[in-house]
UniProtKB/Swiss-Prot annotation:
Family to which the UniProt record says this protein belongs: Belongs to the UPF0270 family.
Name used for this protein in its record: UPF0270 protein KPK_0377
A Pfam family recorded for this sequence: UPF0270
Organism listed in the record: Klebsiella pneumoniae (strain 342)
Disulfide cross-links: none
Length: 72
């Protein structure tokens, strides 16, 4: 189930995004990017509708994923 990111408290949203970014451990190439920059990038993807917050009833967890991969 998609959770509208706009419905979350801003601090809660930031914490979810930060947790996601730290969990992903993505390599950003030759230059390391700050956590704040990575969080801002994910937030922009949510705002543009490229990414969505997804609640898993089975696992009782929230995840962020590309909208194109969501099969809900």
């Amino acid at each position: 189930m998609i959770i509208p990111w706009q419905d979350l408290d801003p601090e809660t949203l930031d914490n979810l995004i930060e947790s996601f970014v730290l969990r992903e451990g993505t390599d950003y190439g030759e230059h390391e990017r700050s956590l704040a920059d990575k969080v801002a990038d994910v937030k922009q993807q949510l705002k543009r509708g490229e990414a969505v917050l997804v609640w898993s009833e089975l696992h009782e967890t929230v995840n962020i994923m590309p909208r194109a991969l969501f099969n809900g």
